[in-house]
Amino acid sequence: MCPLHNLDYEHYLPIFMDGLRCTDNPFKFIANQAVKELIDDARGNEQIITDTVDSLILPIRYALATKEPGTVLSVITILKQLCRVHPGVGPLLIPHYRQILGILNLFYCKSGKNLGDQMEYGLKPDDLVVEIAETLELLEKTGGDTAFAAIKFMVPTYTSAFAQL
């Protein structure tokens, strides 16, 4: 076994991030766990993450483009983890908000649907909306001064997390 910090993050992290859009198990599970563990292992050396942010945007965009609620939830969990690993990641994501937040806006505006007498099983849309709201707040808090304007441009119904203070 090779220690994770010895891996080439610029090579492996985008590959595993691209695997998030897989719907078949065990591939989806392996990709999800690999991304989480690689990001967790980089906590001591944040430069690794800041160097790979640009190469992660395309796999994130492709995964969000599937519009599968489970995949979207996995991606926003990873986005939150990326923002928490190092304060410098937030400002690096701002130029890419146009590619990422458009799909999140579709889910953010969908608070639920009328099913009549039927029941819906699985991930509830409201749960996904709450997770997206938390992600947008974290992106605003870690993104700096221009983050709110960039988020508001892509998600017009978003209200500032700082307005509640």
Language-model region placement:
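N-terminal "cap/leader" segments of large eukaryotic alpha-helical scaffolds
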Residues: M1-I30, I151-L165
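Core helices of alpha-solenoid repeat scaffolds
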Residues: H5-F16, E46-I60, G90-L101, F148-K152
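Hydrophobic residues within the alpha-helices of tandem HEAT/HEAT-like
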Residues: F16, L20, A34-A42, L56-L64, ...
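Alpha-solenoid helical repeat architecture
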Residues: L20-T23, L64-K67, Y108, Y121
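Short, flexible/disordered secondary-structure transition segments
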Residues: F27, N45-I49, T71, V89-L93, ...
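Conserved long hydrophobic alpha-helices within structured protein cores
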Residues: F29-I30, P95-C109
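Acidic, Ser/Thr- and Gly/Pro-rich intrinsically disordered linkers and low-complexity segments
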Residues: Y108-L128
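Alpha-helical repeat/alpha-solenoid scaffolds of the HEAT/ARM/MIF4G superfamily
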Residues: C109-L115, L136, E140-L165
